[in-house]
Amino acid sequence: MKQYNVGVIGATGMVGQRFITLLENHPWFNLVALAASTRSAGKTYEEAVGSRWLMKTPMPESVKKMVVLDAANVEEVAAKVDFVFCAVNMKKDEIKALEEAYAKAECPVVSNNSAHRFTPDVPMVVPEINADHIDIIPAQRKRLGTKRGFVAVKSNCSLQSYVPALHPLRKYGISDVLVCTYQAISGAGKTFETFPDILDNVIPYIGGEEEKSEQEPLKLWGHIEGDKIVLAESPRFTAQCLRVPVSDGHMGAVFVRFENKPSKEEILQAWKEFHGPAQDLELPSAPKQFLHYFEENDRPQPKLDRMLENGMAVSIGRLREDNQYDYKFVCLSHNTLRGAAGGAVLLAELLAAKGYFN
C-alpha cells in the first residue's frame, strides 16, 4: 500500500490526541501536520497541550516539537498532506464550512464530527456495515466542484455497540428496537479529574444523543439513489442515553422485535460468522473477529472487555428471549477507539484501499 501524509485538525482535544496515538506507528499513514485553534497555532504541540494530555500512554516523541498550524489556514495545511482527520470543537455550521473548505482545497476529510452526517451526499460509514456508501463520493465531488476533495464521516459513538450487533440479524426483518445506552465520560471529552459531578452519580441526559441513536442507523442501512443516500424506512428505534461513571466504553441494553423471529442458535451463529469488507480487505486497524459473544452472565464489562482486539471489536452478552420484544441482549464498544478515532482511521484505511486518496 502507498504511504500517505496525513494531518489532524483539532489535534489538541481528546479525540485529536487519540488520533495521534493511533497514527504513531501506522503502516500506511504518516502524520506530518497538526492543526488546532488560533490560540494553539504557532506553539509546539507539547506547549499547546501542556498538562491536558489525556491519553494513558505518553505523548509520542515524534509530535512533541511539531509546530501546531492554524486550522483556519486551509491552504497551508492542505498543501502539506494527502488528507486530514477532523475532530474539532466548534458550532455545527462552522464545522460544515471548515470541512467543505478543506475538500474544496482538494484535501479529503475523514471526520469524527457530526456536522455532515446527514448531508445527503456525504457517506457516513462503518466499514463492516455499509462500505458501499463510499460510492457516493463522485456525486459529492461533482457538487463541490472538486477532482480529489470530499468529506466522509463516521457515525456517532453510541451506535457502535448495537448497530453492528443488529446488522447480521437484518435478514430476519428487524421491525422494532429499544435501546438504552450507558455512555462513558470520555465521550464528553472528560476524565474523572475534570468531571467531578459524575462521581457516585448517573446523569440521565446527553444532549442530542438520543436523536442520533435513533436516526443514524437508518442512514447506515440506507441506499444510494442518484446523487444522495436515501434513509432506510425501518426498523423503528427508540433510545434513552445515560452518562455513567466509566472512563471508556459505551454499553447498550437492546430489545429487538423481528418479522421472522430467529432461534437463539441462529442469532449466535449469525454473530459468529459475521465479517465485512474491513476483514476481507485485511485493513490494518480491523479486528479479526468483529463480534464476540460472551456466555458468562456478567459479561461484557467495560473494564474487562473494552480493549478487545485493540478496542476495535464489539462485545455482546446476555442474549435471551423477552416477554414483550422477541429478544434482549447487552453490547459494548470502546467509544474513543471503535467509536471515534479508531473508527475514523479504519474508514480512512477503507478509502485508501479503494483508491479515493489517489
PLM region descriptions:
Residues 186-358:
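Charged docking surfaces used in two-component/phosphorelay signaling
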Residues 1-204, 235-236, 308, 314-315, ...:
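N-terminal Rossmann-like NAD(P) cofactor-binding subdomain of oxidoreductases
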